[in-house]
């Protein structure tokens, strides 16, 4: 299964989700290909220093280069998980024919319509809060994918 996590600039939430989920999926024995992109990302940007630090505390390296969301990525994905409802709307307007595989992360995992906190410009504590929120959601995602695999 190919999963893409999407946020705005692909420097905070979606790369954190990608790195966290790769770690969780490996521990859980899930066969997934995980990537991330941004709806307004510039190519080849770096993850924010606070995002790197927040994951380093969990012993997860964040060696990331930002990538814009493209037609090619959308076509190859089985599941596209946006960080906010607004991201989902932008994706639907730009890539309408793929809308059936686009959800917010919270919508897909919990059925709720909430957004993942945007830490951009915030303190390291805000990044840790976002990391912890993502980690909990991604553990639930792994459980759901394992259950669906049966």
UniProtKB/Swiss-Prot annotation:
Its EC number is 3.9.1.2. InterPro entries: LMW_PTPase (IPR050438), Ptyr_pPase (IPR023485), Ptyr_pPase_sf (IPR036196), Tyr_phospatase_low_mol_wt (IPR017867). Disruption phenotype: Cellular protein arginine phosphorylation is only detectable in a ywlE mutant and not in the wild-type strain, and global gene expression is significantly impacted in the mutant strain. Cells lacking this gene are impaired in dephosphorylating McsB-P. They also show a reduced resistance to ethanol stress. Efficiently inhibited by Cu(2+) ion, Zn(2+) ion, sodium pyrophosphate and N-ethylmaleimide, while the addition of Mg(2+), Ca(2+) or Fe(3+) ions has minimal effect. Inhibited in a competitive manner by vanadate. Optimum pH is 5.5 with pNPP as substrate. GO terms for molecular function: protein arginine phosphatase activity; protein tyrosine phosphatase activity. Keywords: Hydrolase, Protein phosphatase. The record marks 11 as: Important for substrate discrimination. Induction: Expression is up-regulated in the exponential phase of growth, followed by a significant and gradual reduction in the stationary/sporulation phase. Is not up-regulated during ethanol stress. The active site is at residues 7, 13, 118. It catalyses: N(omega)-phospho-L-arginyl-[protein] + H2O = L-arginyl-[protein] + phosphate. Gene3D superfamilies: 3.40.50.2300. Substrate binds at residues 8-13. Belongs to the low molecular weight phosphotyrosine protein phosphatase family. Catalyzes the specific dephosphorylation of phosphoarginine residues in a large number of proteins. Counteracts the protein arginine kinase McsB in vivo. Can dephosphorylate CtsR-P; thus, can restore the DNA-binding ability of the CtsR repressor by reversing the McsB-mediated phosphorylation. Is the only active pArg phosphatase present in B.subtilis. Exhibits almost no activity against pSer, pThr, or pTyr peptides. Appears to play a role in B.subtilis stress resistance. This is Protein-arginine-phosphatase.
